[in-house]
Amino acid sequence: MFNRNLRAVILKNYNKALTRCLHDAGNLKRPTPPRLPKEQQEEWDRLQKESSKRPVDVMRREKHKDFEGDVNPKTGEIGGPKSEPTVHGDYSYEGRVTDF
């Protein structure tokens, strides 16, 4: 009986201490880089705001083509793919990978 009570007291105190540590860990002030001189800091802040406003439109970028026209100059293939499908070691077309 004494062991059960002792175990309960130890676990209760342990849980309190653990909860306190985890709670306090979120309130720590993290070190930040030193501020720049006023003019440079204003320019830095302005550039940060500008860069966050314009999203990167990756999907609309023009895809790289190895050649122009309908005939592949290396293989003589007519109407085949415009770019090498195994650039990354997989057969992929417009981001979709096939394995056969």
Swiss-Prot record:
Record organism = Schizosaccharomyces pombe (strain 972 / ATCC 24843)
One GO BP:
mitochondrial respiratory chain complex II assembly
Q: Tell me which domain of life the UniProt entry assigns to the organism this sequence originates from.
A: Eukaryota
By what name is this protein known?
Succinate dehydrogenase assembly factor 4, mitochondrial
The text of the family note is: Belongs to the SDHAF4 family.
The record's subcellular locations are: Mitochondrion matrix
Keywords (A to Z) from UniProt: Chaperone, Mitochondrion, Transit peptide
Quaternary structure, per UniProt, is: Interacts with sdh1 in its FAD-bound form.
> Main location per UniProt?
mitochondrion
Q: What does this protein do?
A: Plays an essential role in the assembly of succinate dehydrogenase (SDH), an enzyme complex (also referred to as respiratory complex II) that is a component of both the tricarboxylic acid (TCA) cycle and the mitochondrial electron transport chain, and which couples the oxidation of succinate to fumarate with the reduction of ubiquinone (coenzyme Q) to ubiquinol. Binds to the flavoprotein subunit sdh1 in its FAD-bound form, blocking the generation of excess reactive oxygen species (ROS) and facilitating its assembly with the iron-sulfur protein subunit sdh2 into the SDH catalytic dimer.
